[in-house]
Amino acid sequence: MLPEPSRLRRHADFSVAVRRGRRMGRRDLVVHAFDREQVEALVVTNHGPRFGLIVSKAVGPAVIRHRVARRLRHICADFVGQVSPETDVVIRALPGAATASSAELAKQLRGGLTKMNLLVSVSEEP
């Protein structure tokens, strides 16, 4: 599960990431990313990336939307240590996300983050 400090909660944070951040579209997802270091007032103390989800009614009824959101939260938890700190990432699910597998959603998210150069290389320590 995605840790609490790694979640975007405030509407203002979502708005900044979507409006002022970069965007990368995939078949079932749109990934928005905003570097908080660009605006000093937005630098928070948790020293890690934050993730937010947008799953609209276009994805399906409530049961399907919540299923998609749970799967995306689980996928985001795997990327917490891989995404550069001080980054806000908003993932907007498109209608195809309802039928896509978790592996496919993870692949699309990784592809979007890689295209935006947000993944940091994780060095193996002995």
From Swiss-Prot:
It comes from Rhodococcus erythropolis (strain PR4 / NBRC 100887). Consists of a catalytic RNA component (M1 or rnpB) and a protein subunit. It catalyses: Endonucleolytic cleavage of RNA, removing 5'-extranucleotides from tRNA precursor. It comes from the Bacteria. It holds the Pfam family Ribonuclease_P. The keyword Nuclease applies. This is Ribonuclease P protein component. It is an enzyme of class 3 (hydrolase). RNaseP catalyzes the removal of the 5'-leader sequence from pre-tRNA to produce the mature 5'-terminus. It can also cleave other RNA substrates such as 4.5S RNA. The protein component plays an auxiliary but essential role in vivo by binding to the 5'-leader sequence and broadening the substrate specificity of the ribozyme. GO terms for molecular function: 3'-tRNA processing endoribonuclease activity; ribonuclease P activity; tRNA binding. Keywords: Endonuclease, Hydrolase, Nuclease, RNA-binding, tRNA processing. Belongs to the RnpA family. One of its GO terms (biological process) is tRNA 5'-leader removal. The keyword RNA-binding applies.
